[in-house]
Design a protein with these regions (language model features):
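Contiguous surface segments at macromolecular interaction interfaces
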Residues: 1-4, 8-33, 44-49, 57-122
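Non-catalytic, usually N-terminal nucleic-acid engagement modules in DNA/RNA processing proteins
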Residues: 38
Length: 122
């Protein structure tokens, strides 16, 4: 089992934890062996709040990935297009079973002294 910690904005964390957001969009693909994403909620929360299984990684043309994921992407099309502006390829992590921690954890619990800009392998 391999894990990575993702820094995610609080509004998207809320949607992931509620089960409404089934895809997390990124500009870079993680290692193939990753099967669990640790969820770090960025400022103002600044805590590790849960984890989610990674079902699959969808990679492809920006418009194609949008068409495949938009019903459960949790973002507006305008925001998606802005995020991938000047890019040809989009990455979507398909999220599975979500576990919300009873008590949020600190980054130090995962051997990290600061929040990663995007992700960190654990």
């Amino acid at each position: 089992m391999s894990q990575m910690l993702l820094s995610i904005k609080p509004q998207y964390v809320k949607e992931i934890l509620s089960g409404n957001k089934k895809y997390e969009f990124r500009k870079f693909r993680c290692r193939d062996e990753i099967d669990t994403i640790i969820i770090y909620a960025t400022s103002p929360i600044k805590e590790v709040v849960g984890e989610v299984s990674l079902i699959q990684i969808i990679e492809g043309d920006v418009e194609h990935v949008w068409n495949q994921t938009s019903p459960y992407g949790g973002v507006l099309k305008e925001d998606y297009q802005e995020y991938y502006k000047a890019r040809d390829v989009a990455i979507a992590y398909q999220l599975g079973e979500v576990t919300r921690y009873d008590k949020p954890k600190k980054l130090l619990d995962f051997g990290l002294t600061y929040a990663p800009q995007s992700y960190a392998y654990i």
